[in-house]
């Protein structure tokens, strides 16, 4: 039994230590290269290490610390049952945004951010239902009953909606947080999240203002290798959070089952006590009856002798 417990603990540790990033990984990915110095945003000064050949170099020691902090915060958010929306529509990010969001079972936006995707969520859900309705018509025989022109119109509408909404088709409620690549390009997404008090995790380059970002990850947001490295790390954080969420749920179920059993045992013991009391009362009554009968008998015997 002890061996099984040790094995279970080892497996949990493997899950929780599955993702690590070191300074060398960030350097190899080119995460330290910022923008030209003339394009910098002064608000990023705390995260800049130096200037070299007209380019700002990001302080990767700070980046690593903030990246690990963001990782832990994302684990915590997901472990509480929260969901993450991954956002990255630039060419360098869209492929890995989609693949990593799928890997960790989260929603994503990799084509175009529709205005109101968060702040006007009910309208977005209507568009999703429209897409699902067209897809249903394709399979239920409706397409066979309409004209070729109508079919062409619906097919084009479906393709357009699918391209934009595919990543959020299963998003039935607002996300618990969003992860963004390039906050300058995705400024509408950031503004909508801020308006709704939704935490924002983001890769922030030297040409951006980090004011509206809850968890800043200073890094080169144009290099494919850097984007891939950080997004995969955040997806690992989601997976770790999901494992902790499942573990917590399992513990809650076990606690409820244990409480139910204890309550059942207490009820049985209480019932046994009641039965025992009834039995004792009956026994006492029987003894009283016997005693009374004996008294009556003793009282009658002398009179019969006289």
Give, region by region, the residue ranges found by the protein language model.
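Intrinsically disordered, compositionally biased charged tails
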Residues: 1-20, 240-306
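Ribosome large-subunit tunnel/peptidyl-transferase-proximal elements
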Residues: 16-249
């Amino acid at each position: 039994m002890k061996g099984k417990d040790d094995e279970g603990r080892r497996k949990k540790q493997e899950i929780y230590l599955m993702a690590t990033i070191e300074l060398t990984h960030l350097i190899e990915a080119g995460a330290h290269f910022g923008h030209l110095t003339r394009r910098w945003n002064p608000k990023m000064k705390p995260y800049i290490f130096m200037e070299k050949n007209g380019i700002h170099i990001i302080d990767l020691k700070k980046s690593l610390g903030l990246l690990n902090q963001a990782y832990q915060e994302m684990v915590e958010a997901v472990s509480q049952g929260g969901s993450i929306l991954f956002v990255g529509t630039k060419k360098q990010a869209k492929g890995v945004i989609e693949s990593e969001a799928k890997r960790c079972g989260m929603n994503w936006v990799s084509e175009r951010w529709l205005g109101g995707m968060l702040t006007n969520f009910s309208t977005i859900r209507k568009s999703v239902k429209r897409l699902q309705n067209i897809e249903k018509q394709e399979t239920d025989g409706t397409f066979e009953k309409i004209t070729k022109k109508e079919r062409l119109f619906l097919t084009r509408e479906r393709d357009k909606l699918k391209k934009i909404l595919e990543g959020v088709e299963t998003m039935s409620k607002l996300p618990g947080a969003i992860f963004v690549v390039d906050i300058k390009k995705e400024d509408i997404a950031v503004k909508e999240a801020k308006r709704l008090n939704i935490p924002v995790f983001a890769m922030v380059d030297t040409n951006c203002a980090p004011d509206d970002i809850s968890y800043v990850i200073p890094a080169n947001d144009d290099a494919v290798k850097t984007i891939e490295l950080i997004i995969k790390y955040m997806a690992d954080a989601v997976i770790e959070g999901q494992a902790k969420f499942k573990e917590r749920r399992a513990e809650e179920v076990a606690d409820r089952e244990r409480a139910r059993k204890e309550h059942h045992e207490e009820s049985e013991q209480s019932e046994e006590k009641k039965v025992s009391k009834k039995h004792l009362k009956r026994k006492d009554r029987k003894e009283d009856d016997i005693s009374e009968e004996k008294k009556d008998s003793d009282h009658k015997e002398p009179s019969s002798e006289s």
